[in-house]
Amino acid sequence: PIKSSAASDVYKRQYPGSFDPVTYGHLEIISRASKLFDKVIVLVSVNPLKPCSFTIDERKQFLRESVVAEGIGNVEVDSNEGLLIDYFNEHNADVIVKGLRAISDFEYEFQMAQANRKLCYKAETIFLTSKSEYTYLSSSMVKQIAMFGGDISDFVPECILDRINERLKRY
């Protein structure tokens, strides 16, 4: 892992997202980041342009349970309802980790990384590309399948599956 130079320092990498709900694609990025860095703060963020099906507390709980179920270490789950860069500064983070599924993700995330750098000169963004089996996977897709009673067990951890289905089933 990439460690800090001083024994008392811990590099803090933030992996922000809405995680509505968390998927195996998210968990794969979290797992890889946790192997690379001292600590990863998975940050449940609010995006006012994206209506959520689950509350912040539910999403945090889903993440905590999923990280444990998948055996992922070095992870802390938190939430933020403001600007990512404000949280970044308040918690002395040093890197923002973003997952990329496709080139279209890169275009958006690159713009966000540039905006974050403009707001805070020390904000570095590291991009981790998804494994090919997760390039199509999104929380929106999972929710749509669940709403129509489809099987989402290949997309989300078993420990949260029933709660997702219960909330989203329409028929």
Model features per residue range: what roles?
Residues 15, 42-44, 127:
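Structural beta-sheet core signal
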Residues 18, 45-47, 130:
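Cofactor-binding loop segments of dinucleotide-utilizing enzymes, especially the Rossmann-like FAD-
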Residues 60, 79-171:
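Classical nucleotidyltransferase
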